[in-house]
Amino acid sequence: MKPRMCLILFIALMRVMSIVSAQSSCTNVLISMAPCLSFITQNTSLPSQQCCNQLAHVVRYSSECLCQVLDGGGSQLGINVNETQALALPKACHVETPPASRCHSGSSVNSHSEHGNGSKTVPREKSSSDGSIKFSFPLLAILFTASYITLIYAKY
């Protein structure tokens, strides 16, 4: 493969990956809510502490993505969300969230209201890291492509 062709391929991949990355930002947030699956897909009576910690994190940093859960965002991942359980999650975790009615009104979900669904008590996040390194799919694809191009280019 000629160097010019490699460059064109790399630029095309970068454009595609930037589009995918923009579309999947909430998908990554939904995936991070995996500890809550047993609560929002089944009728488990209490969510785990890990679920509550993750919910508090999402509310703090990506609350707009919570609307996607209520709007069927879980179905794109093959998950059937029990909407009643999903709406009960903030109260069960004692996490204040913006009202669910804001999801359909078009207003910003990030602006907090006095009338949240849950309590004002938010669980503290653990300060210790689990030691894992998390890469996004676009970054992995770019690294893979760059290494492949380097390997091909080195042969010529």
Curated annotation (Swiss-Prot):
Compositional bias (Basic and acidic residues) spans? 112-128
Prodomain residues: 129-156
Task: List the Gene3D superfamilies.
Answer: Plant lipid-transfer and hydrophobic proteins
Range of residues in the leader sequence: 1-22
Localization of this protein: Cell membrane
Which InterPro entries does the protein's record reference?
A: Bifun_inhib/LTP/seed_sf, Bifunc_inhib/LTP/seed_store, LTSS, Plant_nsLTP
Where is the stretch described as Disordered? 99-130
Lipid modification (GPI-anchor amidated serine) maps to 128
A GO biological process this protein is involved in?
proteolysis
Question: Which positions form S-S bridges?
Answer: 26-67, 36-51, 52-93, 65-103
Tissue localization of expression: Confined to the anthers of the inflorescence.
Q: How does it sit in the membrane?
A: Lipid-anchor; GPI-anchor
Pfam families the record matches: LTP_2
Q: Which UniProt keywords apply?
A: Cell membrane, Disulfide bond, Glycoprotein, GPI-anchor, Hydrolase, Lipoprotein, Membrane, Protease, Signal
Positions of glycan attachment: 43, 82, 117
Per the entry, what this protein does is:
Probable lipid transfer protein.
List the protein's name: Non-specific lipid transfer protein GPI-anchored 26
Q: Which organism is it from?
A: Arabidopsis thaliana
Q: What is the lineage of its organism?
A: Eukaryota, Viridiplantae, Streptophyta, Embryophyta, Tracheophyta
